[in-house]
Structures are given as C-alpha cells and as structure tokens.
Amino acid sequence: MLTKRIIPCLDCDLQVPEGRVVKGVEFKEIKYAGNPVDLATRYYEMGADEIVILDITASYERRATMADVIDRLTENVFIPICVGGGIRKVEDYTKMLKAGADKCSTNTAAIKNPELLTEASKVVGSQAVVVGIDAKRRYVDNPSDAPDKNVVETDEGYCWFDCSIYGGREFTGMDAIEWAVKCQELGAGEILLTSMDGDGTKEGYDIALNKAINDAIDIPVIASGGGGNPAHILDVFQKTDVSAALAASIFHFNQYSINDVKQYLKENNVPVRL
C-alpha cells in the first residue's frame, strides 16, 4: 500500500530580498510566517514528505520566478520540491528543475495555454508537471440549473466547482472536474487541488471537491485548503483516495508538528512514512 504524503506549503512573497512566507484566509488577510529557506529546512528535519513552494505574486505581477530561492533551499533540503508561480513556458520548467526543484506547478498559464502541459511533459516528463486547480463552490438549486457543469450534491446543497486564476483574483467559469480530466489528457502528472472556500480557514478539507476530482482522474491528487488539525487530515484520507494532504497554517504557527500529524494518522491505520 502506498504511503500517504504530508506536504507543508510555503506561499512566498518575494518582494523582500530573502523572501517571506505568508498565509491568508480564503486568499486574503495575509499574515507573515517566516523565511522560506529556514521554514523548508525545518519541515524537512521534521519529516515532511515533500514541500510545495508557491510564488504568490509572480503570476499576477509578472515577475521572475524564484530559482535563486530554490537554489539556496536545496542545499539543505533533500526531499521532493514542487515550485509554482510564474511558470508560463517550458523554459520556466527547465530553469526550476536545474535550480533543484523536482516538479513545477502551474495554474493560470495552463488555463490560458493548455498545450503548455503537453509541451512540458515531453521535455521534463509528466512526473514533473503539476497543475494547480484553485476551485470555488458555485451553488445551484438543482442540477438542471447548470446543465453544462458537473454538479455535485454536498451537505450544503448542490454545487459545481469554478476554476480561478491569478491567485484567486479572477474566475474563469470553467468546471474544475472537467478541467482536471483535460489536464490528465494533456500530460499532467499530478493535481494540486485547493479549495478556495477552505483556504486558511482551518475548518477541514472540502471532501466533496477532493472526492469528485480524485474519482474522475487516475493521476495523484494533493488535497489543499482547510487543514486545521490532524483529524481534518485523517478525514480527507478516510473519505477520499487523495494521495497527499497539504497544509500551511497549522505548521507555520506551531499548532502541530508534522510528526504529530503522522503519529496520529498511523494510530488510525493510515500508512505514512515515519
């Protein structure tokens, strides 16, 4: 049985020389959490299975990617690193991988130019091509109210999931389930799935969203958005077949350690690497 992965996420603001890690609520209300190199090193030493580093300003402000940060970070961190933000062309993938990253995640650029996924997968391999999907619930009274969408029944009512771009600043009207299927067809090797409704709230992962996407595709899904305690992480692993859970707030602000989470999962019969 494959072990489930626990992945800390570093949302980076590179407007200061060393970079700084930030965390918000529903992509807003930003708080500062520390230096990306220091935090990544700490999480590696705590037993993280992988680290996701997102340049949250690159796509919106059209600034350069964070190759220099990755280069410094990988001097002391020896687990897979996934980098996102400002990945717009195949050369960005190769630049990040040469700097020491193992995977690159793209959101906006993939939606604007889906063929990027095919081109990148041919050059760097599907295993290095991750698509970030930032999805928000759109409620409807009945499935017939959205005939061209994949409507899901949740405890809160019927809804479909709308893809956003530019760090949650713009919505596309694209169905997230349909887009995930398309990403797999185009050559993506993994989906980083963030619930915009849950992001930073620490109220639990969106089970309906994660189950719907995971059940529709064969490539791994990383659940993101809403993890507030070990029970939330257990919940998403027990109720869906996602391969990994990503969290930020609970680790950045020392509420729980990665080892706390893994011990709890092991005690509840979830396979993890200790």
From Swiss-Prot:
Question: Where is the protein localized?
Answer: Cytoplasm
GO biological process terms held by the UniProt record: L-histidine biosynthetic process
Record's SUPFAM superfamilies?
Answer: Ribulose-phoshate binding barrel
Q: Which residues of this protein are catalytic? A: 11, 134
* Keyword Cytoplasm among record annotations: yes
Which UniProt keyword terms apply here? Amino-acid biosynthesis, Cytoplasm, Histidine biosynthesis, Lyase
Question: Using the chain's own numbering, where are the disulfide bonds?
Answer: none
Drop me one GO molecular function for this one. Answer: lyase activity
Q: In which pathway does it act?
A: Amino-acid biosynthesis; L-histidine biosynthesis; L-histidine from 5-phospho-alpha-D-ribose 1-diphosphate: step 5/9
UniProt GO cellular component terms: cytoplasm
Q: Does the keyword Chaperone apply?
A: no
Q: Which reaction does it catalyse?
A: 5-[(5-phospho-1-deoxy-D-ribulos-1-ylimino)methylamino]-1-(5-phospho-beta-D-ribosyl)imidazole-4-carboxamide + L-glutamine = D-erythro-1-(imidazol-4-yl)glycerol 3-phosphate + 5-amino-1-(5-phospho-beta-D-ribosyl)imidazole-4-carboxamide + L-glutamate + H(+)
The enzyme's E.C. designation:
4.3.2.10
Q: Where is the signal peptide?
A: none
**InterPro entries the record matches:** Aldolase_TIM (IPR013785), His_biosynth (IPR006062), HisF (IPR004651), IGPS_HisA/HisF (IPR050064), RibuloseP-bd_barrel (IPR011060)
CDD domains (UniProt xref): HisF
Q: Which NCBIfam families match?
A: hisF
Q: Can you state the subunit structure given in the record?
A: Heterodimer of HisH and HisF.
**Similarity annotation:** Belongs to the HisA/HisF family.
Describe the function of this protein: IGPS catalyzes the conversion of PRFAR and glutamine to IGP, AICAR and glutamate. The HisF subunit catalyzes the cyclization activity that produces IGP and AICAR from PRFAR using the ammonia provided by the HisH subunit.
Name of this chain's protein:
Imidazole glycerol phosphate synthase subunit HisF
Instruction: Tell me what organism the protein belongs to.
Output: Methanobrevibacter smithii (strain ATCC 35061 / DSM 861 / OCM 144 / PS)
- Taxonomic lineage from the root: Archaea, Methanobacteriati, Methanobacteriota, Methanomada group, Methanobacteria
